[in-house]
From Swiss-Prot:
InterPro entries: Ala_racemase/Decarboxylase_C, De-COase2_C, De-COase2_CS, De-COase2_N, De-COase2_pyr-phos_BS, Orn/DAP/Arg_de-COase, Orn_de-COase, PLP-binding_barrel. GO terms for molecular function: ornithine decarboxylase activity; protein homodimerization activity. The gene is Odc1. Inhibited by antizymes (AZs) OAZ1, OAZ2 and OAZ3 in response to polyamine levels. AZs inhibit the assembly of the functional homodimer by binding to ODC monomers. Additionally, OAZ1 targets ODC monomers for ubiquitin-independent proteolytic destruction by the 26S proteasome. Its EC number is 4.1.1.17. Belongs to the Orn/Lys/Arg decarboxylase class-II family. PANTHER family: ARGININE/DIAMINOPIMELATE/ORNITHINE DECARBOXYLASE (PTHR11482), ORNITHINE DECARBOXYLASE (PTHR11482:SF42). The modification Phosphoserine is found at residue 303. Pyridoxal 5'-phosphate binds at residues 200, 237, 274-277, 389. Catalyzes the first and rate-limiting step of polyamine biosynthesis that converts ornithine into putrescine, which is the precursor for the polyamines, spermidine and spermine. Polyamines are essential for cell proliferation and are implicated in cellular processes, ranging from DNA replication to apoptosis. The record marks 197 as: Stacks against the aromatic ring of pyridoxal phosphate and stabilizes reaction intermediates. This is Ornithine decarboxylase. The modification N6-(pyridoxal phosphate)lysine is found at residue 69.
Length: 461
């Protein structure tokens, strides 16, 4: 396992009843009298560990290989390395990141079917053998650059019901798969298994069933050609937050019977997956500050109703946008919802509003239309479930810097992390079994404890 110490990055250890949202409020309070109200994240590493415990319970036969592309923050990768996950890397840089944390090459799959030759050679020189392919050209490249590679054939799936489709770009058909297996045999390249990806944000769990069935067909083809395949990679597509129509356990309740049917536990086949957003989406909350505001009045409609004819629309400009953290709107089809850092008054009027990023691009719009009470420059908005495909793809367009990330973890989760590193996972440990132990959050975190921040009632967004 990789090492994990809170000294590697600034991770605040939290007291019982002191949550990530309390730290978020505390950070806001710290800059309340300053003009430097930069956007920032609070990321709960304990949430990542809880997701892992949930995974072990829901998919006991499937070893997760975290998709580094989803969120390559060093703290995230360190946490997952420490608890023993594998890693799905798509480039030399991602392999360097993971191996730099002490992860052995056998816990890495180079899961990019279309690789640059120099990066194939890098994988070879650093002991990374598992890698995917879906074409004859890729086979020939690997045969020359990494003849000892252990190849995994990526097959296409029906991803028509996924939010982000992948099978248009990647994956071999069943017909092509046989030809590729025969060609691999001719080239004396070892094919050890099959992989697929049903698309990011899968909305139909039955897609997994068909994909597992297709994988079984390809395994049988491999046997006929002369390969002894022993690895099935079921890819990603698992939800990472609770605001999705399809819940994680709804998917796993369909996957497990399919695996038992087509790849029973005594078949000798190792099963892995490539979850990304599942592990990190809900761990990150983004706080943005309103830097500008504009009021737009609707045109007169001729109505006698003054409220209708003069209703105002409010435009808010905040200090992060689609060129930064909210690139997920453009590239990941995300629909984000602004929450209020301060609780509105019960009788407060709400207005039609829109939220815009800070750049000079007219496309930099975060929310086209929402209903919010009137807010002011200097007020804060919060966006939950912002850990997936946000920080990893953020740019500094127009000179706007990426938000800082403040990492937190409860004392009990920290203790569990250390126990896992020393002795492995405790028997029968489950997500709901993890409580919290009292200690001084100020002592552990090095921050002043604000009474208001430690009151759970103050967190209403």
């Amino acid at each position: 396992m990789g090492s994990f110490t809170k000294e590697e990055f600034d991770c605040h250890i939290l007291d019982e009843g002191f949550t990530a949202k309390d730290i978020l409020d505390q950070k806001i309070n710290e800059v309340s009298s300053s003009d430097d109200k930069d956007a920032f994240y609070v990321a709960d590493l304990g949430d990542v560990l809880k997701k892992h415990l949930r995974w072990l319970k829901a998919l006991p036969r499937v070893t997760p290989f975290y998709a580094v592309k989803c969120n390559d923050s060093r703290a995230i990768v360190s946490t997952l390395a420490a608890i023993g996950t594998g890693f799905d890397c798509a480039s030399k840089t991602e392999i360097q990141l993971v191996q730099g944390l002490g992860v052995p090459p056998e816990r890495i799959i180079y899961a990019n079917p279309c690789k640059q030759v120099s990066q194939i050679k890098y994988a070879a020189s650093n002991g990374v053998q598992m890698m995917t392919f879906d074409s004859e050209i890729e086979l020939m490249k690997v045969a020359r650059a990494h003849p000892k590679a252990k190849l995994v054939l990526r097959i296409a799936t029906d991803d028509s019901k996924a939010v982000c489709r992948l099978s248009v770009k990647f994956g071999a058909t069943l017909k092509t798969s046989r030809l590729l297996l025969e060609r691999a045999k001719e080239l004396n390249i070892d094919v050890i298994g099959v992989s697929f990806h049903v698309g990011s944000g899968c909305t139909d769990p039955e897609t997994f069933v068909q994909a597992v069935s297709d994988a079984r067909c390809v395994f049988d083809m491999g046997t006929e050609v002369g390969f002894s395949m022993y690895l099935l990679d079921i890819g990603g597509g698992f939800p990472g937050s609770e605001d999705t129509k399809l819940k994680f356990e709804e998917i796993t309740s369909v996957i497990n019977p399919a695996l038992d049917k087509y790849f029973p536990s005594d078949s000798g086949v190792r099963i892995i997956a490539e979850p990304g957003r599942y592990y990190v989406a809900s761990a990150f909350t983004l706080a943005v500050n309103i830097i500008a505001k504009k009021t737009v009045w609707k045109e007169q409609t001729g109505s006698d109703d003054e409220d209708e004819s003069n209703e105002q629309t409010l435009m808010y400009y905040v200090n992060d946008g689609v060129y930064g953290s909210f690139n997920c709107i453009l590239y990941d089809h995300a629909h984000v919802k602004a929450l209020l850092q301060k609780r509105p008054k019960p009788d407060e009027k709400y207005y039609s509003s829109s939220i815009w990023g800070p750049t000079c691009d007219g496309l930099d719009r975060i929310v086209e239309r929402c209903s919010l009470p009137e807010m002011h420059v200097g007020d804060w908005m919060l966006f939950e479930n912002m850990g997936a495909y946000t920080v990893a793809a953020a740019s500094t367009f127009n000179g706007f810097q990426r938000p800082n990330i403040y990492y937190v973890m409860s004392r009990s989760m920290w203790q569990l992390m250390k126990q896992i590193q020393s002795h492995g996972f405790p028997p029968e440990v489950e997500e709901q079994d993890v409580g919290t132990l009292p200690m001084s959050c100020a002592q552990e975190s090095g921050m002043d404890r604000h009474p208001a921040a430690c009151a759970s009632a103050s967190i209403n967004v």
